[in-house]
């Protein structure tokens, strides 16, 4: 075993050098931001990281990052109170907090602004996948600003007061208008017997 130690040490060094060489733009930006922060330029460090994440997000496929039932409408991004379970009383509204990721941005009409837009289709199904109700473009969201904001969420509220007690699946299909891509998320839920 001792005769293999120099070889293993050389291999470990080669592997770590390989990883350093392949670090990529996010690692490079993090190093720049750390250097900026160490010299007291907090604003520049923050902007460096924000721009790097914004650029990286454009390489991601469109997807849903988080989808949860919430006890009340959120007050901001990641500022929500999750519902303790997915059982609802008859007549209780289903409120979902959903974070799309990998949105495509394009130039907006105003100088220097960018815009993203997505629609949300809705289906309510039984556990076997049979569609009981549906609506295209249930939600339509447009975000315009001076940067490709990553802290985007949708609050979706569904009123199911006529549904009988039982198990269901709420399916949202998010449609990124700028890329033509779609992402689907299912939220199983139950209507309690009265």
Where are these regions (language model features)?
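Bacterial N-terminal signal peptides that target proteins for export
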Residues: 1-8
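Bacterial N-terminal signal peptides
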Residues: 8-16
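Sec/Tat signal peptide C-region and signal peptidase I cleavage site
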Residues: 17-23
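Intrinsically disordered, low-complexity terminal regions enriched in Ser/Thr/Pro/Gly
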Residues: 24-194
């Amino acid at each position: 075993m001792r005769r293999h130690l120099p070889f293993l040490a050389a291999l470990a060094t080669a592997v770590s050098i390989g990883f350093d060489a392949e670090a990529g733009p996010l690692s490079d930006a993090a190093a720049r931001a750390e250097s900026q922060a160490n010299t007291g330029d907090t604003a520049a460090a923050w902007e460096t990281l924000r721009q790097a994440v914004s650029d990286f997000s454009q390489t991601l496929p469109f997807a849903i990052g988080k989808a949860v039932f919430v006890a009340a409408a959120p007050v901001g991004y990641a500022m929500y109170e999750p519902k303790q379970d997915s059982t609802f009383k008859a007549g209780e509204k289903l409120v979902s907090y959903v974070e799309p990721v990998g949105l495509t941005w394009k130039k907006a009409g105003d100088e220097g602004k960018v815009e993203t837009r997505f629609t949300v289709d809705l289906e309510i199904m039984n556990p076997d996948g049979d569609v009981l109700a549906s609506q295209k473009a249930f939600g339509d969201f447009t975000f315009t600003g001076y940067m490709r904001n990553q802290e985007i969420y949708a609050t979706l509220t569904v009123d199911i007061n006529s549904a009988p007690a039982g198990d269901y699946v709420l399916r949202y299909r998010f449609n990124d208008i700028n890329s033509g891509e779609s992402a689907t998320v299912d939220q199983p839920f139950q209507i309690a017997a009265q």
